[in-house]
Amino acid sequence: MPAAEPVPQPGPSPAAGQQDRTGPAAPPAGTATLAAAPRVGLAVIAALAVAVELAVSARYGYHRDELYFLSAGQHLSFGYVDQPALTPLLARLSSLATGGTLAGLRVLPALTLGVLVLLTGAISRRLGANRAGQLLAALATATCAEYLGALHLLTTTTPDMLAWAVTLYLAVRLLDSRDPRWWLPIGITVGVGLAAKWNIAFLAAALLAGFAATATARPLLRSRWLVAGAVIAAALCAPDVIWQAMHGWPNLAVFHHLQGEAGHNRAVYWIAQVVYTGIAVTPLWIAGLVWSLRSAAGRTFRPAGIACAAVLVLQFVLGGKPYYPGGIYVFLFAAGAVPAGAGLAALPPIAGRVSRLAARMTVIVAAGAIGALVALPLLPAAALHTVPLQKINYDLAETIGWPRQVALIAREYHALPAAQREHTTILTGNYGEAGALQRFGPADGLPAAYSGANNFWLWGPPPAGDVDAIAVNPDLRLLRREFTTVRLVAIYTNGLGVSDDEEGVQIYVATGLRSSWAAVWPAFRDYA
């Protein structure tokens, strides 16, 4: 093993009159020295992870959420019904920078996976992992099915997972150095995370609880730098909070809808943690949880371990979706790498250590390849019919068929008499359908689509003169109440036999709007 390098010393302390009172001197950090980072190995693992994501970035098609964010990016705002403002902005910028291609849209999430791999290695080194442990931790992140699948798409999860990983890295630096100035970048990172997804609030609260529950870390809470970080975080998320307040807190309606899934989420929650991370690396993150909570070596970093455990339990109790706590595994893989790497170093001959490390990495890669089949569009889309991977990763099925659906809608629209088309709008039942029509409709000669779903409702009703409608996946009761005649004209199928939310969607022609769009539009609102 290479010789260990000394721990870098913290920078100069503030002047005596400016110094924070953070309590008595801390006990020694978890490690007296830090192992050298295997920079080439970490870079190779990160680069391979990014390359895999980019290689399949254009397969299948857009996810419904990506279509929605592209539409939202055309209506930039300080807030939206169902999420803060950052992801639509990223979608807009990515589209402008890459020419609006699907592969271009997914460059950012692919790069995010590479950063997560490097951060995992950096955290494990700070925790005291040797070179072998750092490589194991990085490889665990690179092959984690949850990270592979989530960072295949540009969604709110992209900046959210990055914010969690950076926050945990900064928390480790704070605990290791006991320099309270680390609260400032933590506050900035949490604030940026809140501008993408509210989920990181659970991590922030859990970290504060972890510090409060640990005697050696508790003095770090008595710091003006913590207050400054909190103020910055609040300032960064304030535009969204103000927007929500001005629009009647629509996010509460969305949350209420999601609570309807809580029972199912709890039923599959714990097994999902194993499936989503991967069977081969589950022992690693469990070891990391135990090491950070129970071992003497992990005592310095116990607040982070408490935070991860609290997030896991809290999301289960609240019935959150099983992937919500996914950001914690960067830390847990890194923590598990400390005892795993030490176990390898304890083997007597160097050949034995190398062969054992190679064997473990081979197992992780092999298991990761199986996870990649579930997480990524590696198989032909038609195979989803015979190999029902969408039962594990439903997002795969949500990326097929959108151009086909739009083409079917266009066929029915152009089948109408020209005079009728002049006053016919297109209505959809969900934001995915509306987003697909916005993305592919112009090429098929279709007018703008309208929907009552989430922010599409806020963007307003169809033109006042449009008294007829092509209605896709409508609330049939509402449609029949507001129009004189309603007739079924088509049923969409994806042609692959894949069961997804759009398979079997019905398309109607509705004529004779009984009132005005201004009068009936409130009834079409659907925050879900």
Task: Tell me what each language-model feature is.
Residues 357-422, 432-435, 439-445, 452-454, ...:
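Membrane-proximal, lumen/periplasm-facing interface regions of secretory-pathway glyco-
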Residues 46, 137-142, 190, 194:
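Short helix- or helix-capping micro-motifs
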Residues 117, 140, 159-177, 186-190:
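Specific aromatic-rich, kink-prone transmembrane helix
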Residues 3-4, 22, 26, 40, ...:
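Transmembrane-helix signature of polytopic, membrane-embedded enzymes
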Residues 167-182, 287-296:
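Membrane-interface transmembrane helices that cradle and orient dolichyl/undecaprenyl
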Residues 204-301:
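Transmembrane-lumen/periplasm boundary regions of multi-pass, lipid-linked membrane glycan transferases
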Residues 146, 152-159:
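Short acidic/glycine- and proline-prone juxtamembrane loop motifs at membrane-interface regions
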Residues 43, 107-128, 166:
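Transmembrane-helix motifs of polytopic, lipid-linked glycan transferases
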